[in-house]
A protein has these predicted regions:
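Conserved acidic catalytic loop of the alpha/beta-hydrolase fold
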Residues: 2-16
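Short, proline-enriched alpha-helix->beta-strand connector loops that line the catalytic pocket
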Residues: 145-151, 181
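Conserved alpha/beta-hydrolase "acid-adjacent" motif
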Residues: 160-170
Length: 183
């Protein structure tokens, strides 16, 4: 758990600043972390992230809940995988389902060949993940982020996770509206 890892870092390196750097899925976990424990760190860098899409994540959670009830928690649904990741390769000519991950074809090949990357996740994962996205983007939770916590957002204009920059801009705007001073 992220809170445990950061606590361990602070113990191992007393007096040092702790800057949390998170990418893609980790950036969503880190958004949750800063809502709960933001005062424990000195800054956060969210890379390849996205902002509030409450309708999309809410509907996705309902669908994943139905699929989970019908087929089981531990099953892996091609439907859910397609609904979540299916459009990410739109406009990219490639045989790889993971072409969206990087512009460098050699890196995509390494990703495809790595058994720890690109695997299908369970119905329960999708249900929990989409519920988490809904939760982290509720105003009452986002408002718990310390207003003096420096937040640095990075996004690529070719990254479908952040809707090619649009959703990251929504996150920026949301944080500014909440009164976070250094975004």
């Amino acid at each position: 758990d992220l809170a445990t890892m950061i606590k361990k870092c602070k113990e191992d390196f007393p007096g040092k600043k702790v800057i949390l750097l998170a990418h893609s899925f980790g950036s969503f976990v880190s958004q949750c972390y800063i809502e709960k424990y933001g005062a424990e760190i000195d800054g956060v860098v969210l890379c390849g992230s996205a902002g509030p899409r409450l309708l999309l994540s809410g509907v996705g959670r309902v669908i994943s809940g139905i699929v989970m009830k019908c087929t089981g928690k531990r099953k892996k649904s091609a439907l859910l995988d397609t609904l979540v990741f299916g459009t990410y390769n739109k406009g990219i000519e490639s045989d790889s389902a993971a072409a969206w991950i990087c512009r460098d074809h050699e890196e995509v090949k390494k990703y495809d060949d790595d058994p720890f990357c690109g695997f299908k996740v369970t119905n329960e994962f999708f249900y929990d993940f989409l519920g988490g996205l809904t939760s982290i983007h509720k105003k009452k939770n986002m408002n718990k982020i310390p207003k003096d916590l420096p937040v640095f957002l990075m996004a690529g204009d070719g990254d479908p996770v952040g809707e090619y920059g649009k959703s990251v801009k929504k996150l920026f705007t949301s944080y500014k509206k909440l009164g976070i001073k250094d975004v």
